[in-house]
C-alpha cells in the first residue's frame, strides 16, 4: 500500500500510476474484507450446526466458544472498516488539497469530509490541464465509491435481527456516498451499479434494474452492470414462470383461442389490471422487461404490457405512485431500447 500511495501522490499523472487507486482497493482493502467475511461465514456455520465431535468439553461450552469467535471476527471486521473509512477520507482530502480541487468541496462537505484550504502552487498548476483534472475527478469518484462499499459492508455486518429474526438494513450512509460519487461525474456508471447492489439487497428489484440501466447508458458505462442485469432478469423470468399472473395470461390466451365468434375475437386478450401492492406491480414490470430483453415469450409480454399500462393509468388517477416512479419507468424504458 505504501508503494501504491507513493505512486498516487507523487506520480499521479504518469502511466505507472494509472488506476493505482483501484489496486489499493482490490489488493489491500477488499482482500482483507473478503478474508474476514469468509471467516465470519464459516464461524456462523459452526455456530448454527450443533457440534457432533467427541471431546471432553461439553457441547454447550464448545458452541459458546465458537459464538465468541464469531463475535470477535465481527468486531475485527467493523474495526477494520472504520480504519479504512478514515484512510480513504484522508486520501481524498489530501488529493483535493494538493491539487486545489475546490469545486469538489460541495460534494465532500455533504459527506462530512473535512478539507483544509492549503495547497501547493506547483501541483495546483499541473492540475489545471483539463485531462489531468478529469483524471483526478475519476480517482476521487472511485475513492468515494469505495467508501460507499465500506459503509455497505458495515451495515451488512452490524444490523441486528429483530425478535422475529428479521434483519432490516439501513444503507443511508452508503447510498449517500454513491449518490455524491455520481454527482461528481454523472457520465460514469460505477456508482449506479453499486446503487443497484443496494437495491437488490433490500429487495427492490425494479430499483436495481433501473440503476443497472443507468450504469450502462452513460458515456463511461460500467461493463459488469450488463452481466449483473442479465442475471437479475433471468432470476425475474424464473420467478415469473411460476407466478399466478402468468397462469392468468395462459388462461386468457386459451380462452381467446377457443372463441368461435369472429366478432368477439381480439388480437390480444386481457387480464386483470390490478395488483395487490406497488411492490408486486414493479415486480411484474421487471418480469415484463425480462420477457422482452431475453425474448422469452413476446406473446405473454404483450398481454402483460397491456395490464401494466392500464394499471399505471389508474394509478395516475388515484395518485398511487410517486413522481420518481414515473421517471424511473420512463428512463428504464428508454435505456432498455438503447441496450437491447
Where are these regions (language model features)?
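Short coil/turn linking the two alpha-helices of tandem helical-hairpin repeats
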Residues: 33-56, 62, 69, 85, ...
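Extended charged low-complexity segments that act as oligomerization/scaffolding linkers
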Residues: 207, 224, 234-258
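Extended alpha-helical solenoid scaffold regions that build the rod-like backbones
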Residues: 2-64, 70, 74-77, 246-340
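Flexible helix-coil transition and linker loops at the boundaries of alpha-helical arrays
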Residues: 87-140, 179-185
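Internal alpha-helical scaffold/solenoid segments in large eukaryotic proteins
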Residues: 162-234
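A conserved position within tetratricopeptide repeats
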Residues: 8, 40-41, 47-48, 85, ...
Amino acid at each position: 500500500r505504501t508503494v501504491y500511495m507513493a505512486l498516487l501522490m507523487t506520480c499521479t499523472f504518469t502511466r505507472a500510476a494509472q488506476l493505482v487507486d483501484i489496486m489499493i482497493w482490490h489488493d489491500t482493502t477488499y482482500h482483507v474484507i473478503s478474508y474476514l467475511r469468509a471467516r465470519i461465514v464459516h464461524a456462523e456455520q459452526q455456530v448454527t450446526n450443533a457440534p457432533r465431535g467427541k471431546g471432553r468439553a461439553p457441547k454447550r461450552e464448545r458452541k459458546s466458544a465458537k459464538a465468541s469467535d464469531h463475535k470477535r471476527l465481527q468486531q475485527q471486521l467493523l474495526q477494520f472498516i472504520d480504519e479504512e473509512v478514515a484512510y480513504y477520507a484522508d486520501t481524498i482530502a489530501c488529493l483535493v488539497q494538493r491539487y486545489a480541487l475546490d469545486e469538489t468541496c460541495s460534494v465532500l462537505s455533504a459527506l462530512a469530509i473535512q478539507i483544509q484550504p492549503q495547497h501547493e502552487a506547483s501541483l495546483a498548476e499541473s492540475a489545471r490541464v483539463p485531462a489531468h483534472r478529469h483524471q483526478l475527478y475519476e480517482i476521487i469518484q472511485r475513492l468515494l465509491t469505495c467508501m460507499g462499499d465500506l459503509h455497505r459492508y458495515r451495515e451488512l455486518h452490524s444490523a441486528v435481527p429483530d425478535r422475529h429474526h428479521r434483519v432490516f438494513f439501513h444503507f443511508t450512509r452508503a447510498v449517500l456516498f454513491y449518490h455524491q460519487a455520481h454527482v461528481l461525474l454523472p457520465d460514469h456508471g460505477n456508482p449506479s451499479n453499486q446503487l443497484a447492489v443496494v437495491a437488490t439487497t433490500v429487495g427492490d428489484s425494479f430499483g436495481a434494474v433501473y440503476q443497472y440501466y443507468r450504469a450502462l447508458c452513460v458515456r463511461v458505462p460500467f461493463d459488469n452492470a450488463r452481466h449483473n442485469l442479465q442475471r437479475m432478469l433471468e432470476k425475474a423470468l424464473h420467478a415469473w414462470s411460476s407466478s399466478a399472473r402468468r397462469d392468468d395470461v395462459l388462461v386468457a390466451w386459451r380462452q381467446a383461442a377457443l372463441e368461435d365468434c369472429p366478432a368477439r375475437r381480439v388480437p390480444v386478450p386481457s387480464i386483470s389490471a390490478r395488483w395487490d401492492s406497488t411492490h408486486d406491480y414493479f415486480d411484474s414490470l421487471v418480469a415484463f422487461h425480462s420477457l422482452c430483453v431475453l425474448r422469452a415469450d413476446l406473446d405473454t409480454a404483450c398481454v402483460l404490457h397491456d395490464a401494466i399500462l392500464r394499471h399505471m393509468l389508474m394509478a395516475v388517477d388515484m395518485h398511487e405512485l410517486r413522481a420518481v416512479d414515473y421517471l424511473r419507468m420512463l428512463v428504464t424504458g428508454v435505456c432498455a431500447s438503447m441496450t437491447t
